[in-house]
Each structure stands twice: as C-alpha cells, then as structure tokens.
Swiss-Prot record:
Name of this protein: Protein-tyrosine sulfotransferase
Pfam family, one: Sulfotransfer_2
Lineage: Eukaryota, Viridiplantae, Streptophyta, Embryophyta, Tracheophyta
Topological domains, Cytoplasmic: 489-500
Tissue occurrence: Expressed throughout the plant body, highest levels of expression are in the root apical meristem.
Membrane spanning stretches: 468-488
Gene Ontology CC terms, in alphabetical order: endosome; Golgi apparatus; Golgi membrane; trans-Golgi network
Matching PANTHER family: HEPARAN SULFATE 6-O-SULFOTRANSFERASE 3, HEPARAN-SULFATE 6-O-SULFOTRANSFERASE
Length: 500
C-alpha cells in the first residue's frame, strides 16, 4: 500500500514536471515567434530607406543615448548650426508635435528609434553616439546618485517631492521630465533619504571603506544597483534596445513583450542586435564617446559641412550662428546652497550670443565647439561637486573607477552582452567613415595645387601627404623672402634713376 502511494506520488511529480516543461517550451516558442516577427517587420520597413545615407535630409533626428556626451553635441554643435526656429518642440519623454505638419529641421531627444514610425522616413536623417558599455553603465549610476543627492537639501523625502512638483517650470526642461532619469532618479532619491534617516538613528556612523561604489552607509552599492529590476529594465543593453526601438519609452505596442522575451531568453537577443546594427549602418553619423576629438571632427565634416552648405547668406537673415566661444551657461542648481535652493532638478539654459554670419566654415565651427565644451564642462564639474558634497565622503572621479572590483566589471559585461557587440560594430563603422572623410580631405588638398606651375606640381605630387603639409609653411616663408628682396631691389632702382 505504501509502495503504491510512493508510485502515485512519483507519477504525479513526473506529470507535473512534464507540464511545467511544456509550458516553458511554449513560452520560449511564443517569444521566438514574437521576436522574429518584430525583427522581420523592422527590416522590411527600412529596406528602401536611406539609400543615400551620407546626404543630409530635411530633418535631422539626433537619437540621444543617455551618458554618451550627447548633451555636449546638442549645445556645442547642433545649437550653433540650427536656428532656434528650426528646432522641433522638445520631446524628452513623448512626442509633443505632429512631425508631418511641422517644418522643423532638428529633433534631439532621448526617444528610441520607434519614433521613426511617426517621422517622414524618406526625409529624415538619423545620428547617434555610442559609448563603451562599462563606462556608460558606471556613468549612469554616478549621474543617478548625483542628481538624487541634490534633493538632500530638503528635510525629508515628502518635502523634496512636494517642492519639486510645485516648482516645475513650463518653459524649462527638468531632469525629472527626461527619460530615463524620470525613473532612475526618484528610485535613487528614495534610497538616499532612507539611508540618511538610518544614519540619524545611530549615535556614531563609521565609514570604513572609502570606495564610493561600495559605501553602503551613504548610498546604494553599485553591485546592488546592477541587480535591481529597474536596472534590468532600463539600463542593461540600453543602447541596443534604444536603437532597436524597444525601451520602456517605446512608441511600439509590442516593445515591452519583445524586450521581456529577450531578457528572459538570451539567445533571442541576436535578432535584436542585428536590427540595431542595420540601423547604425543606415545612419548619417555614428560617433564614439571614447574617440572624442576624432568624433567631433567627423561630425563637423559630415554633418556640419552639409548644414553650412544649405545656408544662403544674406545681410539680415543669415541663419548660421558664429557664436562666441564663451557661450554663457546659466545653471539653476538642484538644491544648491542658499541662493538656488529651489528644487531637486538641474535646469540648464544656454544664453546664446548670436552673431549671424553666412561665412562660417568647418574650421570655425570646430573652434566654436572647443570653446563651448570648455565652458560647459566647467559648469558641469561645479554642479557635480555641489551635489556630491551632500553625501561626503562619497565622490566620483575618473580615478575612483579603478576601485570597482573586477568581478563587478565582469558582471556589467555579462548583463550588457548586446551592447558590447553593438559597440564593437560601431567602432568598425566609425573607422570606415573616418578613413573616408580623411581621404576626401586629402583629395581636396591635392586639388588646391592645380593652379600651381607644372614644374612645382610635379615636385609636390611626388611628395607624400605628410611631407607636403610640412613643406607648405617653408614655401610660404621663401615666397615672402623673395617678394621682400624684389621690393627692396625695385626701390633701389627708383632711387638710382632720381640721382642721375
């Protein structure tokens, strides 16, 4: 009798495991079909779009992946090239205008690629910047802490939340209005207040570790941040999902389910990765955060030159803005000391000194950019210092990133496996475009000597490009010396004739 009961129990467990297994198999099968259907649909929509990807279309869509340096590009490049009247209404969270009716030329947003479904594809060029996934994730963590720490000027979380919602200004974009910070900052803010309250209950708080990424008494440790559901949904593989159009801010109805399937079954991620790669291939410009100077130069020559060429100069209405290199940046600090204790968000307004000119060149654009980023970085540095002093001794610098344990770095790589591959692919695209532009510039420099005497052209033609550029200053100096002697000699002849 006992053996019969054991046999029945075993049979029941076997049937149960079989049912569970079949459900899991059905779940995978459903996900596989769903992801494949989405990938096929995405590919077919883009088959005949952007055949001439290197030509700037009527609308430039800057797909801004968070923490890649896109804010610098927007303020120090794009706002110098486009007049404010040419900017589309801000769409940091959702689309706030009808793109088929508006005649704007620049759309810069944290929206993902799904926004393209609402834009006139045949008249839209896309650009983006990609960053090393490890650096991007660390920067996301640091910025979440930095912005959330600004709220600690308030006595408690209720006060901070009430004040920030009350002071929202309609004409200024707040960090809490922007995806993904509208999710990440409140999450970190709540954690910082909870830890501060816990410290107040203790008579003495001893912080033994000076590693800001593992300072549990002050803030959420990095390894816990990485494992949280919010991080899995928004941060990990964030660049791939954003370029694929599958974030939790997507305009696609199926985005959540597709993303969930890929997160649950890693093998399905390859389909999403391939879609993201094809979209990078079709873009007008792909920059790299780590190759800052080269990326800026490439942007100026690929995008900037085309925007400049479309401008028709006129005395009163030229639209190219040769801004002074010291762009005036006004920052309303989040919870800054005394004078600016207003709310828990960072609000940035650029007061542009506009000197309209139709004579701006790629060279002057780069000069303006260099001056602008120097000022902008200084302002950002000041803001960070003021924020992080509220959670002293925690502080983030380039040097402190070396304190992150190797196993945590490996964890970031594993959780961002799609982004790792996408970044590798972006580097290949960047290298090809950089070489192409460099060759065009060399060809242009060769054409500039067409009008020289044939003997001199022959000599220069045999010289290498590097030697050629070294030769130019010397040649100019020799030419000036010859002209000087000719001038002196002519003067002497005139003097001799007068004496006779």
């Amino acid at each position: 009798m006992q053996m019969n009961s054991v046999w029945k129990l075993s049979l029941g467990l076997l049937l149960l495991s079989s049912v569970i297994g079949s459900f899991a198999e059905l779940d995978f099968g459903h996900c596989e079909t769903l992801v494949k259907k989405w990938a096929d649909s995405s590919s077919s929509r883009e088959e005949h779009v952007n055949k001439d990807k290197r030509s700037l279309k009527d609308l430039l869509f800057f797909l801004h992946v968070p923490r890649t340096g896109g804010r610098t590009y927007f303020h120090c490049f794009l706002r110098k090239l486009y007049d404010s009247s040419e900017e589309c209404p801000r769409s940091y969270d959702k689309l706030h205008f009808n793109p088929r009716k508006e005649k704007c030329k620049l759309l810069a947003t944290h929206d993902d690629y799904s926004l393209m479904a609402k834009l006139p594809r045949e008249r839209t060029s896309v650009m983006t910047i990609v960053r090393d996934p490890i650096a991007r994730v660390l920067s996301t963590y640091e910025f979440s802490v930095e912005v959330a720490a600004r709220f600690l000027v308030h006595p408690n979380l209720t006060s901070a939340s009430r004040m920030s919602s009350r002071i929202r200004k309609s004409n200024v974009i707040s960090t809490l209005d922007i995806w993904p910070w509208k999710y990440l900052v409140p999450w970190m803010r709540e954690d910082l207040f909870a830890r501060r309250d816990a410290r107040k209950l203790k008579e003495v708080v001893i912080i033994e570790d000076d590693n800001p990424y593992d300072m549990e008494e002050m803030l959420m440790p990095l390894h816990k941040y990485l494992d949280a559901p919010t991080a899995h949904d928004i941060i990990h593989n964030g660049a791939t999902f954003q370029i694929a159009g599958l974030t939790n801010n997507s305009h696609l109805s199926e985005a959540h389910e597709v993303r969930h399937c890929v997160q649950k079954f890693k093998s399905l991620g390859e389909s999403v990765l391939q879609v993201a790669k094809r979209r990078l291939d079709s873009m007008l410009y792909v920059g790299l955060t780590e190759e800052h100077r080269e990326s800026a130069s490439l942007f100026a020559n690929v995008v900037g030159s085309q925007v400049l060429s479309q401008v028709v100069p006129s005395n009163a209405t030229a639209k190219i803005k040769a801004l002074k290199s010291e762009a005036s940046v006004t920052i309303s600090e989040t919870g800054s000391d005394k004078s600016n204790i207003q709310n828990g968000t960072s609000e940035v307004t650029l007061n542009k000194a506009e000197a309209k000119s139709g004579n701006m060149t790629v060279k002057t654009l780069m000069e303006v950019y260099e001056g602008c980023i120097t000022h902008l970085r200084k302002s950002q540095g000041t803001r960070r210092v003021n924020s992080l002093k509220r959670i002293t001794p925690a502080n983030f610098t380039r040097g402190t990133r070396t304190r992150v344990p190797k196993e945590v770095i490996q964890q970031i790589k594993s959780l961002n496996n799609l982004d790792v591959e996408l970044y590798k692919y972006a580097k290949v695209i960047f290298a090809k475009e950089h070489e192409l532009v460099s060759n065009k510039l060399i060809s242009s420099s060769k054409r500039s000597i067409v009008d020289l005497p044939s003997e001199l052209k022959s000599v220069l033609g045999e010289m290498g490009e590097e030697k050629l550029w070294k030769f130019v200053p010397v040649a100019l100096m020799l030419l000036l010396i010859v002209l000087f002697f000719l001038f002196v000699n002519a003067k002497r002849r005139r003097t001799s004739k007068v004496k006779i």
